[in-house]
């Protein structure tokens, strides 16, 4: 038989056991509940970037059922779901080259009919831009040349670099917006190496650059010829001369042929002069001259310069209609000079010096002229030259004979 005291002890023991069991149950439940936490992405990287796509990869902490991938609009602050998947890699496609995009990944875990969502993990990624190809040299001059290349889709501009031999590295030349550029202030008959890359400015302001192109070599032409002129002119010959062009190996000389209607090469020269002989008086010719040099095993040329040249025309014979002049007025006559373009008439108050041009006759068949306003000198002297027009100047004959007359002023 259980005594009252024993009943009391038993009751206390039962209550204590119940309390212990309740505490254990609550502790076990709390421990279990604490383990069910939302998974979190700990790292997100752009594993591969292309011109129209970006492949992202990420790492996660915690148990995961799947992932939701979003694009994030920085202006509207809104997420747009792209895909739900279980893999930790995703390729975002149909993108624009050279642009920035914000991609977010949000993991989730499902348990007991509930979904535990992690935080959005955002990452700004960038598409690439194509490498420049198709570089060509469009023009070649002594101190500059023009390069052009295939236009890169999405490019906002291009960076150009050239190889500096002294610095032994590529240095910046400049930036252009179009797919061509002209490089100037270069050394003639030389080789220059270039690399070019495209760039775009993303919507977030970041500059995205392509890889540099393969090295491209361009050349400059031979130096341009200057000072091309005719000298030592006679009735049957003359000399063509010009200034020596730095870095030139030689010169090509051409003469226009009326028979073929084109220029024909008459000489390849190392010197800076060429004598023309065996001509008739007042015979005209047109010449072209250009320098050359050899660069990278290829012959390059300078600009072509043109010169019109002629031998002297025959000197005319003149006479006066009268040996007496009245009130500074005189009439001159002379013979027509074959192939001349006109005549210059000169007057002086001295027989051997001081002759000045008084009048030009611009017709070869006009062989008379009346001069007025000759002044009050007692004796006046007259000479004439025939001329041939060449380019912007003249080739004149020797002076004619000298005629004189007394000048009477009434």
Which residues does each PLM region occupy?
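Pro/Thr/Ser/Gly-rich low-complexity, intrinsically disordered linker/stalk tracts
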Residues: 34-62, 97, 115-154, 188, ...
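Tandem-repeat architecture and repeat-register "anchor" residues
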Residues: 44-47, 82, 104, 135-138, ...
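Solvent-exposed strand-loop boundary residues in beta-sheet-rich modules
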Residues: 62, 73-77, 111-113, 153, ...
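Recognizes extended acidic, P/S/T-rich segments that occur
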Residues: 68-96, 159-187, 252-280, 344-376
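Short beta-strand/loop motifs in extracellular/secreted proteins, especially
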Residues: 65-68, 156-158, 249-252, 285, ...
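Beta-strand-rich modules
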Residues: 92-111, 183-203, 276-297, 371-392
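Bacterial N-terminal signal peptides that target proteins for export
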Residues: 4-17
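Sec-dependent signal peptide cleavage junction
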Residues: 24-38
């Amino acid at each position: 038989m259980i005594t009252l005291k024993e009943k009391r002890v038993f009751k206390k023991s039962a209550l204590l056991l119940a309390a212990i069991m309740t505490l254990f149950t609550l502790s076990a439940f709390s421990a279990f509940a604490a383990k069910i936490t939302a998974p979190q992405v700990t790292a997100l990287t752009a594993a591969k970037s292309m011109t129209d796509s970006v492949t992202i990869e990420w790492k996660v902490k915690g148990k995961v059922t799947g992932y939701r991938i979003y694009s994030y609009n920085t202006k509207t602050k809104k997420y747009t779901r792209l895909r739900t998947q279980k893999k930790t890699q995703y390729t975002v496609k149909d993108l624009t080259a050279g642009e920035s995009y914000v991609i977010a990944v949000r993991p989730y875990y499902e348990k007991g009919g509930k979904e535990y969502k992690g935080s959005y993990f955002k990452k700004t990624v960038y598409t690439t831009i194509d490498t420049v190809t198709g570089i060509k040299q469009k023009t070649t001059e002594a101190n500059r040349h023009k390069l052009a290349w295939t236009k890169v889709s999405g490019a906002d501009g291009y960076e150009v670099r050239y190889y500096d031999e002294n610095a032994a590295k590529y240095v910046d030349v400049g930036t252009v917006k179009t797919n061509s550029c002209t490089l100037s202030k270069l050394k003639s008959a030389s080789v220059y190496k270039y690399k070019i890359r495209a760039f775009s400015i993303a919507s977030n302001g970041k500059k995205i650059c392509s890889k540099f192109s393969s090295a491209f070599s361009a050349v400059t032409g031979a130096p341009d010829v200057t000072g091309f002129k005719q000298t030592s002119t006679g009735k049957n010959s003359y000399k063509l001369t010009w200034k020596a062009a730095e870095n030139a190996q030689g010169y090509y000389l051409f003469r226009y042929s009326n028979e073929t209607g084109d220029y024909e090469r008459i000489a390849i020269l190392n010197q800076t002069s060429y004598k023309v002989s065996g001509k008739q008086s007042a015979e005209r010719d047109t010449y072209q001259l250009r320098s050359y040099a050899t660069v990278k095993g290829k012959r390059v040329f300078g600009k072509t310069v043109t010169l019109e040249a002629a031998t002297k025309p025959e000197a005319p014979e003149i006479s006066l209609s009268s040996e007496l002049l009245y009130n500074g007025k005189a009439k001159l006559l002379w013979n027509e000079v074959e192939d001349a373009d006109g005549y210059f008439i000169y007057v002086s108050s001295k027989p051997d010096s001081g002759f000045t041009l008084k009048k030009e006759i611009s017709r070869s068949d006009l062989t008379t002229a009346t001069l007025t306003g000759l002044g009050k000198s007692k004796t006046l002297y007259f000479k004439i030259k025939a001329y041939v027009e060449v380019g912007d100047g003249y080739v004149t004959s020797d002076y004619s004979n000298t005629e004189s007359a007394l000048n009477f002023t009434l």
